[in-house]
Amino acid sequence: MATITLPMVPTNEQQELLVQTLAGIRSVLDEQGAELIGGHTMESRSASPLPASLGVQITLAVNGRSSQSPWLKSGLQPGDALLISRPLGTGVLFAGAMTGATKATDLDAALKGMACSQHTLLEQLEPVRGDIHACTDITGFGLLGHLGEMLQNRTGLKILLDGAAIPAYSGALDLFERGISSTLAPSNRAAWRWLDNTVQLRQPPSAALLELLVDPQTCGPLLLACNSKAAAQLTQNGPWLRIGNATTG
């Protein structure tokens, strides 16, 4: 279901905006085998921006059904490998873009990656479904925040991270080194408490790496925990990268 709010412009312009907006929505849904079954159209009471396309507001209500049990965050097991599907750093790149500090080429590269749907990765995961014990997507809480969620109520488990293996979008670490960070970063830094004992880094972390661990993500990567056999298979052809493992003691 789609709710589309159009700007206050002449009717013919509204019709064209609606047609183009619906075409854009369908282009994404069709690729993933989803259907647009209906919706509502409204008109904004605010002044129309220029260009008028900036005044289009879209809300989608998405429902799905699966014949199989979903992967949860809570299934982490000793010996599991931790894999990530794409780089981190969108939060700081957007923060830098607001002040002109982010290079245009770096921002374009990140946007290109963010625009790629990850639904095709699910097809890649299907052959090893039974070997995957936990899965989530990294959002505004950052990598470390989601690792903390995986560890909740998992007494005796620890995570050993390879900081050098954690991927970052081009330009992200440089921005951290210049003191730039997202507005959500200060609250996310509370997750650094996990580094006291439960989450350990193989190498002493740089200040930039510490910031990357809590950088809030938009269109962030998938993070999964699986056994070593599945990890070897998934990392062989990409895009999966192994960033650590779960251990005991």
Where are these regions (language model features)?
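Short, contiguous, pocket-lining structural segments
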Residues: 89, 109-117, 135-143
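Glycine-rich anion-binding loops of enzyme active sites
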Residues: 2-103, 245
